[in-house]
A protein has these predicted regions:
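Hydrophobic hinge/microswitch elements
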Residues: 156-161, 165-169, 174-175, 225-282
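Secondary-structure junction motif
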Residues: 204, 218-239, 304-314, 318-331
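Flexible hinge/capping segments at coil-to-helix
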Residues: 180-219
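Short helix-boundary/capping micro-motifs
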Residues: 40-58
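A short LG(V/I)-centered, amphipathic sequence patch enriched
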Residues: 70-87
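Beta-alpha-beta core module
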Residues: 181-187, 191, 253-303
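Alpha-helical linker/hinge and terminal dimerization helices associated
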Residues: 72-73, 92-114
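Central regulatory/effector-binding core of bacterial HTH transcription factors
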Residues: 118-181, 249
Length: 335
């Protein structure tokens, strides 16, 4: 005889109800990958009609899949007026993007294991670094892994970091540190802030100057409010100095081009001055300015595919080989 009949009865009732709950949840979450794919298309293309065109289907099909997903989850995922995801929709979209990335990684891994490393790898890169890194990187990828399809995206750190986080990019070379907590960062190199001076300017040939000397001359700068400019202004303000702007140019590559064409000296990150042919200009190092760090970021919540790992290894090798020969760049990548 059961010495605890009441307890046994309660346990049996709880177990029965728990099994019923599990069955109900499982049956209500009959979502499929097509529903998630259609939801992502609506969010990324910002309308049902644009999503339908991207998916090569009719709008009613997209609407049906999204509506079924909303019914199964018991909540609205897309606000039909603003066409923006709701709070619940954002949560689903974040996970759906990771699922999409993992599914593509599965296919790429199997192909790479059976044959050669193959598949598409999406690489973001800040423009200043891309100027001298892109050509050797793409060349080395082609030599080592001809079946790889690299896609290179040139943009700013503030644009690239979120795209790595949401799965649009597999990795990105950006200025660090980044604020996104979901990103994993690997240091690549630090770069000095350097002056490019026309050959006939008093700074030309100086080799190295201090902050006081820099403040005596009018130089081209990025605008106030940009990360690069604000960091420099803070450092000079800390020692009681202020820069004189000959012009403010919103774009480091344009700023470098103007300096090389002889308009005026420009204060630039070292990677922005790499790759230009020699001419009637001079590079001047500045003592007292902190270096700017550059690193490789990837989403820490996903497992990189074999093509992504192969691309990362090639990128590391290119940095180790090429970066030490660029003026003002100091490799921080581990051996």
């Amino acid at each position: 005889m059961d010495p605890f009949p009441i307890r046994s009865f309660l346990v049996s009732q709880i177990t029965h109800r728990w099994r019923g709950c599990i069955s109900t949840v499982a049956s209500s979450l009959a979502m499929d990958l097509r529903q998630l794919g259609h939801l992502l298309a609506v969010v990324e293309h910002r309308s049902f009609s644009a999503a339908a065109r991207a998916l090569h289907t009719v709008q009613s099909n997209v609407s049906t899949h999204v509506a079924k997903l909303e019914k199964e989850l018991g909540t609205v995922l897309i606000d039909r007026h603003s066409m923006q995801p709701t709070a619940e929709g954002l949560a689903v979209v974040e996970r759906a993007r990771r699922i999409r990335t993992e599914l593509q990684a599965i296919q790429d891994d199997i192909i790479s294991m059976r044959h050669e490393v193959a598949g598409e790898v999406r690489i973001g890169c800040i423009g200043t670094t891309g100027r001298w890194m892109a050509t050797p990187l793409l060349g080395e990828l082609s030599d080592r892994h001809p079946a790889l399809r690299p896609v290179l995206v040139d943009a700013t750190t503030t644009s690239l970091a979120p795209r790595v986080l949401n799965g649009d990019l597999d990795m990105a070379v950006v200025n660090t540190p980044v604020v996104e907590a979901g990103l994993e960062t690997e240091p690549l190199f630090d770069e000095e802030r350097i002056v490019v001076a026309p050959g006939d300017h008093p700074l030309a040939g100086a080799g190295t100057i201090d902050l006081a000397t820099l403040a005596e001359h009018r130089v081209m700068l990025t605008p106030q409010g940009t990360t690069f400019r604000d960091a420099i202004d803070r450092e000079l303000e800390a020692v009681g100095l202020c820069l004189q702007a000959a012009a403010e140019v919103d774009g480091l590559r344009l700023l470098a081009s103007l300096a090389y064409q002889g308009y005026a000296p420009a204060l630039l990150p070292a990677s922005a001055v790499s790759g230009y042919p020699e001419g009637g200009w001079s590079l001047v190092h500045v003592e007292g300015l902190a270096r700017r760090s550059v690193g490789l970021v990837r989403n820490r919540r996903t497992t990189p595919s074999m093509p992504v790992l192969a691309t990362r290894d090639v990128l590391r090798d290119v940095i180790r080989e090429i970066a030490p020969h660029q003026p003002g760049i100091h490799v921080t990548l581990e051996p």
